[in-house]
Structures are given as C-alpha cells and as structure tokens.
Amino acid sequence: MKKKILIAAVLAFLAVLTLVSCSKDKPAESGDLGDSVMVQIEMQNGGIIKLELYPKAAPITVENFVNLVNEGFYDGLIFHRVIKDFMIQGGDPEGTGMGGSDTKIKGEFKQNGWDNPISHVRGVISMARSRSMDSASSQFFICHGDATYLDGQYAAFGKVTEGMDVVDEIASVPTDKNDRPVED
C-alpha cells in the first residue's frame, strides 16, 4: 500500500503538464534560427521546463504550439508516453496517444520538403505525428536522449533551455508495457 501511494505521489508530482506562459524573447544563439519564442511548462509540483522555440526553423509548428498554449489547450495534460533515454511525450487531451487538437498542420521536415536544421538531440522538442506527414496537431515530445535518426522525419521546433532535470525525473517514472506511466 505504501509503495502504491509513493508511486502515485511521485507520478502526480511529475506527470501533470501545465503550460502557463509564452512570450517573445531575444534572438536565438544560433543566428540561423531567428527570433525565438519562450514557453514555460510548469509541473503540478512546481518544477519548470523552459523551452526556446524557433519560428524560422518551423514557423507553422511554432505558431500552432503557441496558439494551443495561449488557448489553454495543454493545461492539466500529462506526459502519456515515457521512454527513458529516448523521449517524453505529451499534448494528448485523452492521455492515450490517440487524441489531439482539431487542427492538423504541415510537417516541417526534410521528407516533407521543408529544410529544418534542428537535430533531434537531448532536450529538443518536436511534434509527434501518425504515419501521415501532415498529421501533427498537439502532441509533442522532448528528447531525453539523442535521437538523430528522427532528423528529417519529424518537425523539431525548439529546445529545453532550463529544466532538463525535470525531464530526467519524468523519464525515470515507472511505465507499463505501452510506455505509459503506471499512475497518472
């Protein structure tokens, strides 16, 4: 019983995603990526993940993500898919990996005719999608480890600037055979 309560407390502490602020910021360090947009993910426990988004690399993706943030779409959602050393995934209002927003956007990556210079390395945020190249809507993932084999196949659009320790904590929660945290 104590173990179940502890696991539930840890997951409640880590897994609830609430995006609470979004604002323009100074240009990115890499002049190639243009002005950046800062987004902050605030966890239920107060943990913070700060993201720098790059509209020059993926303008449609960044605009969609920021619009969803501003609408409160992500408020209260969980990271529903967690694979240590690969990624943590959120943005599904159903919490199953099958849901999303009503809007589907163009996949901004090489296989879909878009020059996106961002590589899927530790800390990069990218859009999740189905097999269809233009199926991304609201689900996203943050790379927990390098996944450069995804380059050219998924729309990377920013990176974690602060809070990788929070990503590491989420990536360490117990999961079931479908990579879903065992407790919401």
Question: Predicted regions span which residues?
Answer:
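Cyclophilin-like peptidyl-prolyl cis-trans isomerases
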Residues: L6-D184
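Positively charged n-region of N-terminal signal peptides that target proteins for export
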Residues: M1-I5
